[in-house]
Amino acid sequence: MLFESFDLVSALATLAACLVSMALLLAVPQQLWQLRWTATRDKSCKLPMPKGSMGFPIIGETCHWFFQGAGFHASRRQKYGNVFKTHLLGRPLIRVTGAENVRKVLMGEHSLVTVDWPQSTSTLLGPNSLANSIGDIHRKRRKIFAKVFSHEALESYLPKIQQVIQETLRVWSSNPDPINVYRESQRLSFNMAVRVLLGFRIPEEEMHCLFSTFQEFVENVFSLPIDLPFSGYRKGIRARDSLQKSIEKAIREKPLHTQGKDYTDALDVLLESAKENNTELTMQELKESTIELIFAAFATTASASTSLVMQLLRHPAVLEKLREELRSCGLLHDGCLCQGELRLDSIISLKYLDCVIKEVLRLFAPVSGGYRIATQTFELDGVQVPKGWSVMYSIRDTHDTSAVFKDVEAFDPDRFSPERSEDREGRFHYLPFGGGVRSCLGKQLATLFLKLLAVELAGGSRFELSTRTFPRMISVPVVHPTDGLRVKFFGLDSNQNQIMAKSDEMLDATV
């Protein structure tokens, strides 16, 4: 019996020793990894490094970030403050939240910081993309791109965008099954970008293949830069190469399809603007610019479109107020949108619609933030940002923590009304499109698209949630519902109006 006790104690001691050894094997490399990055502080600066954790060797905290989403940043912000360090997507970075901190980063372009995307993003978008250009090259390219989003250009795109939205909503309404709004909004954004902005005439079957390829590209834009078979990075590269091949074919065939064309598309404007600035774009530059245009329209617009549908479902009073504005402006009559094309000035004049879109983008900013790299050591919120470190300024967290917005978690479009104007306190409290010299060039186009979608939803559709509860939102790679948001859409022809009039009382979630 005594020997059996010794055997048990010995086994427990061995197990304990193994557990301690394993803990040390994990803890020691992790501690050395932490020290490795702490040692990069600027010793000539007396300020301390930001607090934070660098996670595990090589992968850092990438897995935590991927699975926790917005909760990852919120938990670390609560623990370490508005400026903290971490290690994501294969590199160290300092995450920055708060209007004043963000203002210093954005206004410090060319003096304190310059652009610096994660390696995977930079590689997949390409060296000729606007996002990757710096200095004089960036200023020149931005000037060329600016004409693509001018008032005149938007007026030209508007009828075609409205037509694509109307056709899409008709398809949704004719489907007897619920629609996955996020996935179909991606398809809508993609069709708008390819057919309207770029003017490509691609067969439907080829469009389906191109859409799937682009989805794979977007899903791997933010990935660990490890080029191995079956890695996300390798999938992204393959998707990029396939897209460039298809786009080159479409660009070369484009002059063959000009007959009967009644508007100027973004690619036409881009080429014309380049000539006006004494620049001739190479085929590689055109391919990368085209992918960048589609990318900008695809992921973020689909995210915001889905958030818009969800909030109109959640808040029927907001939708009814939107309909009332359309009625008062003569755009909605007897429950249906008046026939004819909308004008850009008419859309701009809809003030409550503008408030609704602004509030959707405040509460559900599609993009988490932007990336920079410190070109010199500087102070931020009492800590040092060492030269050479990546900096990510947070859009979403800055919105969530801003003191200028009352009841910050509530969906309240009237906060942007002329009477309240909660965003007047400072432009860096509200920045869904970034800020500074790198603010999103396409913000007016994105806003126009969302406004047109809202008008068509309010005046030309009835829709209801097909699940018992609203889904949870996740933020990687952009904000979207976990289930895509399952919604049943109904048409508004005369017969359908009678059906809906009878069923409205029974469908509390129908708007």
UniProtKB/Swiss-Prot annotation:
Membrane-protein topology: Peripheral membrane protein
InterPro entries per the UniProt record, alphabetical: Cyt_P450 (IPR001128), Cyt_P450_CS (IPR017972), Cyt_P450_E_grp-IV (IPR002403), Cyt_P450_sf (IPR036396)
Cysteine-cysteine disulfides: none
UniProt key word Repressor: no
Known cofactor(s): heme
Stated family: Belongs to the cytochrome P450 family.
CC per GO annotation: endoplasmic reticulum membrane
Ligand binding (heme): C440
Subcellular location: Endoplasmic reticulum membrane; Microsome membrane
The EC number(s) this enzyme carries: 1.14.13.-
Alphabetic keyword roster: Endoplasmic reticulum, Heme, Iron, Lipid metabolism, Membrane, Metal-binding, Microsome, Monooxygenase, Oxidoreductase
One GO BP annotation of this record: central nervous system development
Pfam families membership: p450
Reactions the enzyme catalyzes: all-trans-retinoate + reduced [NADPH--hemoprotein reductase] + O2 = all-trans-4-hydroxyretinoate + oxidized [NADPH--hemoprotein reductase] + H2O + H(+); all-trans-retinoate + reduced [NADPH--hemoprotein reductase] + O2 = all-trans-18-hydroxyretinoate + oxidized [NADPH--hemoprotein reductase] + H2O + H(+)
Gene3D superfamilies: Cytochrome P450
Name this protein carries in UniProt: Cytochrome P450 26B1
Domain of life: Eukaryota
One MF annotation (Gene Ontology) recorded for this entry: monooxygenase activity
Known role: A cytochrome P450 monooxygenase involved in the metabolism of retinoates (RAs), the active metabolites of vitamin A, and critical signaling molecules in animals. RAs exist as at least four different isomers: all-trans-RA (atRA), 9-cis-RA, 13-cis-RA, and 9,13-dicis-RA, where atRA is considered to be the biologically active isomer, although 9-cis-RA and 13-cis-RA also have activity.
Transmembrane stretches, start-end: none
Source taxonomy: Eukaryota, Metazoa, Chordata, Craniata, Vertebrata
